[in-house]
Amino acid sequence: MQSKLLLSTKLTSQGKTQLDQYFVSPPFKVMTLPAYDDAWQNGLNAMQMSSSPGLLAGDLLDIEISLADNTALSLNTQAFTRVQSMNEGDYATQKTCIKLGKNSRLFYLPHPLVLHKDSGFKQTTEIEMSEQSELIYGEIVAIGRVLNGERFAFRHFASYLRISYQNQPLVTDRIQWLPAKMALTSLSQMEDFSHQGSLTYVNLAKNAVEIKAMVSELQALAAEQKNMLIGVSQLNEGGLMVRVLAHRADIIQHLFERIGQVLKAQSNIV
């Protein structure tokens, strides 16, 4: 199965964000949602949906998202993405390309990815920022169907994230998990946790002092959480990263949604 999702935004004469170009092939679908109380006023809320029960060997998902200048998009997904069992040497693949226009804002938090026994999955995410643009991007991965006693039974997971501005890298994050060859339960790895989450925030309108204050606020929020291991780090330029280990996916997702609201509220783009 080769599936494509293509969407872009535009700004109306009333200053509201709307879908512009929109193309999907099965099993993808996108549904726009009613406006709700949010710090990004006049932004567009949308849900990325899929009718597939999971990814199979040879599946390729191609996602392209483009935000026009001065638009804002909050994009969530409908359900967990499950990578099903497959033969040795087989993989499912996802490629995501995102471009943010000047003064644009994107909040993108897909549901967790679940790696089933004997699965192989490779994903690449490339995001290009523009002047004064803002990004809140999250990823959550489960090491297996934990409630079924499945832990690190997948074959291979590879993830590459690159965020750049004017073709210069701002963030590069690479994950390689090979359970048969790596001690993934050791100290400084997953230890006894079953879910990992990463949330990256980049705002090119913020200076280092402002970002540092936001890091301190999120560290205070992290200290209130139970049954999670949380780290908040300031990026070299214009942003921060939150890394979380936990025993359940939903608590990471709820935390990231809460952090997203905190970060949106401090946006200085009108």
Curated annotation (Swiss-Prot):
One of its GO terms (cellular component) is cytoplasm. InterPro entries: UreD. It is found in: Cytoplasm. Its main location: cytoplasm. Keywords: Chaperone, Cytoplasm, Nickel insertion. GO terms for molecular function: nickel cation binding. It holds the Pfam family UreD. Belongs to the UreD family. UreD, UreF and UreG form a complex that acts as a GTP-hydrolysis-dependent molecular chaperone, activating the urease apoprotein by helping to assemble the nickel containing metallocenter of UreC. The UreE protein probably delivers the nickel. Required for maturation of urease via the functional incorporation of the urease nickel metallocenter. This is Urease accessory protein UreD. It comes from Actinobacillus pleuropneumoniae serotype 5b (strain L20). The gene is ureD.
